[in-house]
Amino acid sequence: NKGVDGFRCDMAEMVPQAFWAWVIPQVKAKYPNILFIAEVYNPNLYREYLAAGFDYLYDKVGMYDYLRGVTSKNWSAEGITLQWQNVDDIRDHMLYFLENHDEQRIASGFFCGRGMCAEPAMIVAATLGKNPVMIYAGQELGEKGMDAEGFSGMDGKTTIFDYWGIKSLQAWANHGKFDGAGLDDEQRKLQTFY
């Protein structure tokens, strides 16, 4: 009744599956359209967490890690096939992403250096199946996450521990006009791509 339409459950595998198998049906009985997304990094447990009621699981140690390797480490794209085949029976329940609060920004010096270099990986993530794709705030603008902000320091991520401005989103917001006038040409091109 608060308008929440989903829960992203951080490190869900650290909580016993029995709990999720009990709580998720309780919530869905009252709010049948609510989504539960789990962060589970052990592929051997994926099917168990889906059976416990989760709608989607982060595909971090499969598709994310591999797409990052192709994008920034010159891995062969041929291995992408194995990544989706490993979860083919549950692929519609795997959430693809290229950035999140735990991972370094694509445009950071720790990953790729430019947001545009991940366009091929984003096309793969968005078109390989019917499963959802997450775009992290600022990813569509090439946010670098290269500030030495607060607790986390300069690590190529946008801090989640401190009150901090996301430069690309501030440029897009343009002092409350929300017209993107503060974006540079590369940011505009990337936003058009997304």
Predicted features and spans:
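The substrate-binding groove and active-site-proximal loops of carbohydrate-active enzymes
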Residues: 5-14, 61-73, 103-114, 175-178
